[in-house]
């Protein structure tokens, strides 16, 4: 199993554990034809969540997470990064592995970005996504 697949599986498991701890009900899609990893049921609605993670710093106290999927077009050898559509996911959950910290971003907060810059707790500034740090209430 490649390292990124293993890290992704571990991040999904960590998300499901934390989401269960805050009182959410969860389901996983079967098959690989959907863009989300977990379905969250809060008793009123169901949300599609894409889980991402990173374990390495981009620069001091700053992480980056890909907020895109890879698609192959025609004869292109290299895949192209394509941002998630609102019709594909409702939330992106980004896990900073060394920090054991989650960012829970609604799709609208992605604003078409393919890379998210996320600040650690030790950073002097709050960062562009600070309001989504441990924002589990958005899923409740």
Regions flagged by a language model, labelled:
Residues 52-100:
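Catalytic cores of nucleic-acid endonucleases
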Residues 32-36, 100:
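Short acidic/glycine-enriched loop/turn segments that link adjacent beta-strands
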Residues 91-124:
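Domain-level recognition of nuclease-like catalytic cores that cleave nucleotide substrates
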Residues 19, 38-40, 47-53:
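Conserved catalytic cores of phosphodiester-cleaving nucleases, focusing on short active-site segments
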Residues 42-44, 98:
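A generic beta-sheet turn/junction motif
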Residues 26-33, 43:
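Active-site metal-binding core of divalent-cation-utilizing nuclease and nuclease-like domains
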Residues 114-140:
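Charged phosphate-binding loop/patch that engages nucleotide di/tri-phosphates or the phosphate backbone
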Residues 1-27:
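Acidic-basic catalytic patches of nuclease active cores, encompassing PD-(D/E)XK
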């Amino acid at each position: 199993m490649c390292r990124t697949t293993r890290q992704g599986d571990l991040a999904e498991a960590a998300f499901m554990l934390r989401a269960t701890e805050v009182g959410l009900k969860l389901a996983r899609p079967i098959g690989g034809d959907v863009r989300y990893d977990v379905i969250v049921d809060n008793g009123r609605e169901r949300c599609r969540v894409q889980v991402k993670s990173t374990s390495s710093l981009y620069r001091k106290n700053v992480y980056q997470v890909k907020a895109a999927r890879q698609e192959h077009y025609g004869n292109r050898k290299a895949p192209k990064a394509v941002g998630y559509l609102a019709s594909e996911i409702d939330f992106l959950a980004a896990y900073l592995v060394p920090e054991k910290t989650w960012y829970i971003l609604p799709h609208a907060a992605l604003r078409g970005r393919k890379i998210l810059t996320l600040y650690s707790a030790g950073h002097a500034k709050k960062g562009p996504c600070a309001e989504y740090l441990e924002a589990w209430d958005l899923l409740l």
